Each structure stands twice: as C-alpha cells, then as structure tokens.
C-alpha cells in the first residue's frame, strides 16, 4: 500500500533478484585409490579446479543458472579424489534493464549459488576421508569479462 509518497511504487520498480529454488542437477565424487590414498602423503597434492557458468532463459523474467565445478587432487595414478558438481538455481529477475540482464544472470546469480556449491564439495571431500576442500571465492565478474574477451577474440574481424 502506498503511503502517499510513492514508496510502494518505488519498491515495486526496484531491481530484484529472487532465488526461486536451488538444486543439485548432477554430482559425482570419486576416491579411486582408497584406502591407499587415505594415508599420509609425502607432499601436498596438486589441486585443479575448473568453473563453468551456464544460463538458460525459462520465461520472460525467469532464468536457470548453473555453476559446474570440476576438480581433482593429485595426478594420474596418484589421484586422491575427483569431483564434478552441477549446481543450479532458478532466478526471477525483476525491473532489470535489458542491457544489465546478461551480466546480472552470469555474475550475480552464480555469486548467490556459489557458497552452497562450495559447501557441497567441502562435505563430499571430508566424507571421502580427506580434510574438507574449501574452494576460494570466485570472482564471477572477472570470469564473465574473460569469457566476453574469448568470444570477441574468436569472432571474425571486419576489415575497413
């Protein structure tokens, strides 16, 4: 209800990101060398992590956004563990300009999902017999800019 100063109307026009639901789409954890891999290690394992962000528009203001986290500790025959998590959420975006929609979907939505995906990985690694793996925070804005640069670099250049 408006209070005479247009407060309700202003609130109705404010940009909003609503997480409607979050869910695990796919998850895999492998501990291929257990129980041998669970003993003391001579040196710290090489940990590799890849991050991918995908999005799909479901309706005019609804988007499904996925973070895919793939990682491993160790290499080759000395692999301690591997994981792959596809964690997603459905977001309703309101009052966001068309120019801002893509960055919001690809930066802000994954930023909201990441802490939950990070905890799933940490819990799985701990349940696999290892100390929990807490993935460092991800700069989704930098990841977005990098992806835009890659797309621009692969696009055919027009000669004038």
From Swiss-Prot:
GO MF annotation list: unfolded protein binding
Cellular component terms (Gene Ontology): cytoplasm
GO-annotated biological processes: protein folding; protein tetramerization; protein transport
Name of this protein: Protein-export protein SecB
Family named by the database record: Belongs to the SecB family.
InterPro entries on file: SecB, SecB-like_sf
Source species of the chain: Beijerinckia indica subsp. indica (strain ATCC 9039 / DSM 1715 / NCIMB 8712)
Location of this chain's protein in the cell: Cytoplasm
Classification lineage: Bacteria, Pseudomonadati, Pseudomonadota, Alphaproteobacteria, Hyphomicrobiales
Claim: Transport is one of the keywords in the record: yes
General function of this protein: One of the proteins required for the normal export of preproteins out of the cell cytoplasm. It is a molecular chaperone that binds to a subset of precursor proteins, maintaining them in a translocation-competent state. It also specifically binds to its receptor SecA.
Main location: cytoplasm
